[in-house]
Amino acid sequence: MEEKKLLFNIGPIWFDGTIVLMVLLTCIIVFAFVYACTRNMKLRPKGKQTVIEWLVDFIRGIITDNLPRKEVSNFHLMAFTLFMFVLVSNILGLVTKIVVGDDLSVWKSPTADPIVTLTLAMMMIVLTHFFGMKRFGFKGYLVNSYLRPVGFLLPVKLMEEFTNLLTLGLRLYGNIFAGEVLLGLIAGTVASVGLWVIPLAIPLEMIWVAFSIFIGCIQAFIFVTLSMVYMSHKIETEE
């Protein structure tokens, strides 16, 4: 049965209520986590402060590997925020799934929706163009991004912009959506076959949840890494 959506509109624009609520919940969780981990910080970190400092250093490592060293501080906060948002978004719907009424889903991963992932991808691609123009000016940006090292590659580079958007967004969507679908199939099997499969279904569900969370972490890492790679293509001078 096709999953129903909690739709509402503001003028001519329609929204998925579940996705809106889950995105807001993701933002609240990220903010609360960072707030809790950065209260009463000490010179010698321990506990929650150790976790947040490890995450900050981890993200700094991603940026350092893909951007010039002088640019690390400029994009560190953006990359950290993006990583945390994508990570929490990936995990939310893998921990549990709530369906009420006539197959109406009220709890799912925001990144299991292609509109969310493609919007995130579009946002990052637009930001790469913005920072490229800020660095080189409009004319210099066009020359550096599309006419170097040779001008006849212009059609290929224009196509690359489109493919970068699709691969960045659809890769994330596909992995998270597939994880949720399989979890739903396992739960559906228990409901349709009978309680006697629970001893097999529970360990299988737990294993797949753990694997899906691992995949969610990897996908957050890949999304941020590719975003920084695309950013470096726009703000570094092409030889």
Swiss-Prot record:
Chief location category: membrane
Subcellular location: Cell membrane
Assigned GO CC terms: plasma membrane; proton-transporting ATP synthase complex
Transmembrane segments: 13-33, 75-95, 113-133, 174-194, 208-230
Pfam families assigned to the protein according to its UniProt record, in alphabetical order: ATP-synt_A
Topology term for the membrane: Multi-pass membrane protein
Acyltransferase keyword on record: no
Keyword Chaperone belongs to the record: no
Family matches, as InterPro entries: ATP_syn_F0_a_bact/chloroplast, ATP_synth_F0_asu, ATP_synth_F0_asu_AS, F0_ATP_A_sf
One Gene Ontology biological process: proton motive force-driven plasma membrane ATP synthesis
Stated role: Key component of the proton channel; it plays a direct role in the translocation of protons across the membrane.
Family designation: Belongs to the ATPase A chain family.
Subunit details: F-type ATPases have 2 components, CF(1) - the catalytic core - and CF(0) - the membrane proton channel. CF(1) has five subunits: alpha(3), beta(3), gamma(1), delta(1), epsilon(1). CF(0) has three main subunits: a(1), b(2) and c(9-12). The alpha and beta chains form an alternating ring which encloses part of the gamma chain. CF(1) is attached to CF(0) by a central stalk formed by the gamma and epsilon chains, while a peripheral stalk is formed by the delta and b chains.
Protein name per UniProt: ATP synthase subunit a
Recorded name of the encoding gene: atpB
